[in-house]
Amino acid sequence: TPGKTQLINYFEIKFKTNDVENPYVYARFVDLPGFGYAKVAKSLKASWNRNLTSYLEQRPNLQIFVHLIDSRHPNLEIDKNVDEFVNHIKRGDQIIINAFTKTDKLNSSELNKLKRDYPAGIFVSNLKKIGIIELQNKITEHLFGN
């Protein structure tokens, strides 16, 4: 639910490799607060914004920003602001992946329009397990070059 995450949550993921000496590599996924959606005081949002900016700018190991966008509402101001913000602070070695969620809720013409409007996007449905492998591949390709 948008706005429910109010803390930074970390998830360490183990990836299996073909290297006998190093059979696993690890990546940490970080779930950041969706501060644009949260129903909290403006002063708290301002504090989150400062802390988030500092966090993102001071982490040289951050490689990928995955921006989850509700495919039913792809042009929300908050999503445009997030995209602009991340593009402003990201380094040349970092990428942004726009992952459009809940694509199962769109009819075929709506989905086709979304794909035309956002050709670099990845279109996913957790419910129908659509696009999940493509998203995983995009992430692992950037992280590990495979």
Model-derived regions, located:
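Conserved residues at the C-terminal ends of beta-strands
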Residues: K14, L68, V124
